[in-house]
Amino acid sequence: MTPSTEALPTAVKAQVLAEALPWLKQLHGKIVVIKYGGNAMTDDTLRRAFAADMAFLRNCGIHPVVVHGGGPQITAMLRRLGIPGDFKGGFRVTTPEVLDVARMVLFGQVGRELVNLINAHGPYAVGITGEDAQLFTAVRRSVTVDGVTTDIGLVGDVERVNAAAVLDLIAARRIPVVSTLAPDAEGVVHNINADTAAAALAEALGAEKLLMLTDVEGLYTSWPNRDSLVSEIDTATLSQLLPTLEAGMIPKVEACLRAVSAGVPSAHVIDGRVEHCVLVELFTDAGTGTKVVSS
């Protein structure tokens, strides 16, 4: 028990634990897809807390599926190797050389580190990529920059999901840790935005929830007015709000809209800078961050 919990009165501890019961019952046996990113995957304390949360969910009979990116780590490795990097329209221009680095970093570094952190709690996590068992099929995408359609190289969207491999891991009570690399129909591998991939996977798995870890407290209807933080919003309202959001938040909101519109009961934008934010969101009445529901 940490010093922070030791300082709490016994009655408060009891109330928190009792409050979790209906949520534990509701989520038992259900799939929860978590997009892991931001400070939660670069700060050592937060990384360990996230891994513990995944083990906690698994031991409560809930099925977590983790989808991760690795933008900062890819940038650092490109710099270390002396490979120039460029961004257009908010996306990394991905040459074959850059893709080789992305594959090495996403699956060989970021994914491995998270798998090992989770497995410190037991033999739970298994790392896979969208290349494994045809999990994802990619389709190449472009971006619009100043009104001009612009090629950004080997960057894709998810065209199809074959969830069989992930479902097999879930049936074996493993925790899938998914790196978002995927081949197109011709076998050419692309890097896929992790927010997009998480939403597509949540839809294909029939997940109960999609959680998006960010570096903000949730969704603000009028940023930077911190009083505009909303605890719940429906898809119709959020769709209207989308054009006004900060650029970095748009892919996350689009992912939430896609998942909920496809039948996932709720998507949640939560603050990954808070230790055990996943547990707070799932097992307390007030939760944390912003919950997105169908209109």
Swiss-Prot record:
Provide the site residues for: Transition state stabilizer: K35, K252
Task: State if Transport is listed as a keyword.
Answer: no
Recall the GO molecular function terms of this protein's record.
Answer: acetylglutamate kinase activity; ATP binding
Report the locations given in the UniProt record: Cytoplasm
Q: In which pathway does it act?
A: Amino-acid biosynthesis; L-arginine biosynthesis; N(2)-acetyl-L-ornithine from L-glutamate: step 2/4
EC number(s): the record gives 2.7.2.8
Please tell me which top-level EC class this enzyme sits in: transferase
Q: Does the keyword Repeat apply?
A: no
Q: Which reaction(s) are listed as its catalytic activity? A: N-acetyl-L-glutamate + ATP = N-acetyl-L-glutamyl 5-phosphate + ADP
Binding positions for substrate per the UniProt entry: G70, G71, R92, N191
GO CC terms of this entry: cytoplasm
Might you name a Gene Ontology BP term for this protein? L-arginine biosynthetic process
Q: What does this protein do?
A: Catalyzes the ATP-dependent phosphorylation of N-acetyl-L-glutamate.
NCBIfam families assigned? argB
The name on file for this protein is Acetylglutamate kinase
State the species of origin.
Mycobacterium avium (strain 104)
Originating gene: argB
